[in-house]
């Protein structure tokens, strides 16, 4: 039992976040963490600039001193040449130091960025989503994850004819709506028919006013179904769809109480 517990604990430790990386990956992470910042190069550049500035200041001061304490027959060309050379060297070294500092700043920025990304990777799961990485690099919040894809809506301009597939899909979507209205109209019609077929002495016999009201309700339901069917047939551009719609309307009108009432009369 103890051996099994130890094996289970070892498996849990092996599958932990710190054991997601391979040996080579851990070695790369260790080298990145131990990489020193290039501060020594920056200090050397500053010391060199300071040394050249001292030489330039000394040469300019010597030039001024020789001009004030000029002796008979002493030329000022040599002190001036020394001062000009020192100032020129200072300018050149300043330009080079500026470029080195710029490159050094980019290098330090990359190192810090790499360390931030590596620290972020250690805290994440074994598999990192692309949007999570992009949002981290861009400094933005990742978009919310939708478990289901949003429905795609097809927008058709009124000037363009609707394709056949679109018409059939619309008819399929509205089919339950049409069936519900048709069943409601048929139930009203059957109720009025059952009332008329009952004998005056039967318990189901009602007065003429209530019978007329039920007839009107049945007629109203059938008329509504007919109206909706005709409107749908007009808005669907598919010829086959119109034929199916008109056929359904004919079936409903055949069973309507109006038709049966005329037949009985």
UniProtKB/Swiss-Prot annotation:
It holds the Pfam family TAPR1-like. It is found in: Nucleus; Cytoplasm. One of its GO terms (biological process) is regulation of cellular response to stress. Residues 156-170, 195-212 have a biased composition (Polar residues). GO terms for cellular component: cytoplasm; nucleus. Disulfide bonds: none annotated. InterPro entries: HAPR1 (IPR040308), HAPSTR1-like (IPR029196). It comes from the Eukaryota. Residues 1-22, 145-170, 195-218, 240-265 are annotated as: Disordered. Keywords: Cytoplasm, Nucleus, Stress response. Transmembrane segments: none annotated. Its main location: nucleus. Oligomer. Belongs to the HAPSTR1 family. Acts as a central player within a network of stress response pathways promoting cellular adaptability. Functions as a negative regulator of TP53/P53 in the cellular response to telomere erosion and probably also DNA damage. PANTHER family: CHROMOSOME 16 OPEN READING FRAME 72, UPF0472 PROTEIN C16ORF72. This is HUWE1-associated protein modifying stress responses. It comes from Xenopus tropicalis (Western clawed frog).
